[in-house]
């Protein structure tokens, strides 16, 4: 095990140790535990304002300037008039994400408020519909009551009319019987016989066996089809044709042709 360097030096001064072992060189490995390594030498040489440091961006390998107090950054030196001091992209993304999340929460809250108001409106609409149905039901019940009363009144009036009609018929029959009892002689049927005797000489019933017709006999009926046929040929207004029928003419012609052939 080698002796410490300080002990070797003392022993060498006393002459006890003649050979000094060289101090082993230790390999110094500089480890950077910071994501944004600061270049202190460049910061000192450029004479940056207080709280400003030059830092290398490991993602792109370019330096930028960082204010540790305000947490603002700039690609150019703060002494450069063209420098633009802003927040870092990471900070902007996080702030934008927070703003968007906050906006989404506000939208969700407003949507919930709208849904709540809509539910309130639906509830009020249902209550209005229920009240309207109740009013309609009460109106229908009231109308049924009125209809029932009206029907009873009409029934009573019909009953009264029936009683009045029966009374009138009974009184009419009583007057008729009273007249027959008071008449000294029976009614003559002179008017009826006169009506039967009056007969129009042009009426077919006056000179044929056709039955006597009325004033509407022979007139076209409303529900009778207009076929063009002579409906009076077999009706009550039948008159003898002054000429033979077409069928009789054809039969006579056929008979004449047969007689000629036989001759």
From Swiss-Prot:
Region 3 X 2 AA tandem repeats of [DE]-R, as annotated, extends over 139-144
Please give the record's comment on domains. The WW domain may play a role as a transcriptional activator directly or via association with the transcription machinery. The WW domain mediates interaction with WBP11, ATN1, SF3B1 and the C-terminal domain of the RNA polymerase II large subunit. Except for the WW domain, the protein is intrinsically disordered.
Kindly state a single biological-process term from the GO annotations of this entry: cellular response to exogenous dsRNA
What gene, per UniProt, encodes this protein? PQBP1
Principal subcellular localization: nucleus
The protein in question is named: Polyglutamine-binding protein 1
Residue ranges for the region (Important for interaction with TXNL4A) are 243-253
Q: Where is this region: Disordered?
A: 94-263
- The organism named in the record is Bos taurus
Q: Which segments constitute the WW domain? A: 46-80
Annotated Basic and acidic residues bias? 99-173
Among InterPro entries, the record links this protein to: WW_dom, WW_dom_sf
Q: What does the record note on quaternary structure?
A: Interacts with POU3F2/Brn-2, ATXN1, TXNL4A, HTT and AR. Interaction with ATXN1 correlates positively with the length of the polyglutamine tract. Interacts with RNA polymerase II large subunit in a phosphorylation-dependent manner. Forms a ternary complex with ATXN1 mutant and phosphorylated RNA polymerase II. Interacts (via C-terminus) with TXNL4A and CD2BP2. Interacts (via WW domain) with ATN1 and SF3B1, and may interact with additional splice factors. Interacts (via WW domain) with WBP11; Leading to reduce interaction between PQBP1 and TXNL4A. Interacts with CAPRIN1. Interacts with DDX1.
Q: Where is the segment annotated 5 X 7 AA approximate tandem repeats of D-R-[SG]-H-D-K-S?
A: 104-138
């Amino acid at each position: 095990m080698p002796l410490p360097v300080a002990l070797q030096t003392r022993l060498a001064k006393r002459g006890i140790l003649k050979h000094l072992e060289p101090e082993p060189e230790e390999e110094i490995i500089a480890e950077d535990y910071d994501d944004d390594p600061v270049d202190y030498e460049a910061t000192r040489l450029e004479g940056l304002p207080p709280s400003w440091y030059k830092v290398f961006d490991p993602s792109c390998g370019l330096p930028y300037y960082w204010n540790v107090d305000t947490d603002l950054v700039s690609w150019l030196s703060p002494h450069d008039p063209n420098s633009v001091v802003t927040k870092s992209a990471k900070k902007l993304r996080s702030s934008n994400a927070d703003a968007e999340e906050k906006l989404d929460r506000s939208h969700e809250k407003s949507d919930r408020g709208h849904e709540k108001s809509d539910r309130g409106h639906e509830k009020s609409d249902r209550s209005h519909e229920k009240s309207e149905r109740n009013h309609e039901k009460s109106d229908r019940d009231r109308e049924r009551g009125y209809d029932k009363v009206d029907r009873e009144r009409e029934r009573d009036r019909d009953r009264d009319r029936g009683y009045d009609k029966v009374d009138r018929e009974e009184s009419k029959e009583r007057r008729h019987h009273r007249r027959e009892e008071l008449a000294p002689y029976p009614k003559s049927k002179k008017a009826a016989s006169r009506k039967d005797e009056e007969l129009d000489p042009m009426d077919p019933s006056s000179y044929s066996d056709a039955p006597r017709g009325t004033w509407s006999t022979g007139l076209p009926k409303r529900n009778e089809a207009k076929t063009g046929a002579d409906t009076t040929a077999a009706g009550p207004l039948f008159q003898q044709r002054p000429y033979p029928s077409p069928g009789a003419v054809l039969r006579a012609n056929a008979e004449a042709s047969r007689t000629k052939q036989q001759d």
